[in-house]
Amino acid sequence: MITQEKSSAALPLHRTMKCLLQVVAKRLLSWHLSDYQNDEGIIKESSSQIYSWRLKVDTKIKKWLKAGMNIYGHYRETSTPRVNEYDGLIQQAMYFPSTIEPQDEDGNYNNSFFEGSSTYNPMGHIWEADNANKTINNRIQGYVQFDIMDGLSFRSQLGVLLDNRLNTSVQNDKSYYAFKNSNLSQGQARSYWNTSWLNTNTLSYVKEFNANHRVNATAVFEQSYDNNFNHTGTAYGLDYIDRIGINNLAWSNAELATNSSDRVINTLMSGMLRV
């Protein structure tokens, strides 16, 4: 089954496409879902695209054995002008006179009010915007359940997360950053990598003697691992910024470049017994 939605009567523009495939067999239940969504914001250069997917399989192997797997994730790409509380696009647009042209005859921004006080032209936030935020996220979940005897069962499940993000931005010599920093251009790339998993093992026993008497016992053992790595590289005074952009930050003023990185690892092991 494929469905498609499109709304273009008024901005923002929103497009959605979905595809669903379901298979049912004697001992197998499987379904697949994919989705695409594209949003174009009211402000130019503002957009969001996301592709998502899911594959789910459940099966009964034996009378006493069940298993299943769930794989899902998404890829997302967004971009937006500078919309901040301080000196952002919306704030600047509210106060900047509409009778002043965005640029003069030489293509330079008119960055001042009538009386001569300095302020960044709000159209520069849109026309000079050059940034992208990309995320790819994948999750895998699986389980195995053993029905050992009447009322007694054991279930082990494992979930894995793989998450990778890349945020890039280029501030050329006409950007807001250059306006505030003596015409100095900037390029920045930030990457995040996360790997984590969670394993949960549950042993449960339920026995009913009559309407008023029942035994319910549960034992749980759980362990998890989380590994996060972040890296940021920032360059200033970029060469051939309109041609190379973020693709080679080494073509810049090496004396001003900065790099930073960090890694955080978390582990956990816990248990619980309840009767």
Label the model's feature ranges.
Residues 151:
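Active-site and adjacent substrate-binding regions of carbohydrate-active enzymes
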